[in-house]
Amino acid sequence: MKILMIEDNVSVCTMTEMFFFKEGFEAEFVHDGLEGYQRFTEENWDLIILDIMLPSMDGVTICRKIRETSTVPIIMLTAKDTESDQVIGFEMGADDYVTKPFSPLTLVARIKAVIRRYKATGKAVIDEDMIETECFTINKKTREVLLNGEPVENLTPKEFDLLYYLVQNPRQVFSREQLLEQVWGYQFYGDERTVDVHIKRLRKKLASEDKPFLYTVWGVGYKFDED
């Protein structure tokens, strides 16, 4: 297992490295946020461990940027035992969190649990231009969508972008505000009901007797799920 740990506390990294070695994990440790994100983009990793408080770029920002292109499992580290930090991490796409100070054995156990869940949930296979799941093949370059091998016709540009983003992040719940930011862009100042309208249209175009695909999470937002 290839792990990238972005943590500015050298002592924590040194202690953790010994336990990773015993488990047979291949780990790289980076102590700067911006440098750590750069390392993420340069290689393929099986798991990312992120401290929230980092120089140059904080862990929450790194997590959000990673989730723009990847479903790699992410564990957040925080020195603050507060619910707000945990919620922010989960909202940005983290899979789990560990509160400092922690036992390396606890971190190893969390890593194994996250990897088990990751393998069991059938995350999307993603590269720069293509997403392939059990039911969908989505080509970002040609903007083509296949559902069970059949083309999905007449998607508007924003419908395609919204579907691509949700399929890229399976089972992750997004608020309307988050979807406006991620799909329409930070410069978009429209009504949040715009998201509802696009979801409704997508559901009609993806109509399936077996699976709804796009689910409403009442009081929160929407998620994509093939189960």
UniProtKB/Swiss-Prot annotation:
The keyword Manganese does not apply. Could be member of the two-component regulatory system YclK/YclJ. Its main location: cytoplasm. One of its GO terms (biological process) is regulation of DNA-templated transcription. It comes from Bacillus subtilis (strain 168). GO terms for cellular component: cytosol; protein-DNA complex. It is found in: Cytoplasm. This is Uncharacterized transcriptional regulatory protein YclJ. Residues 2-115 form the Response regulatory domain.
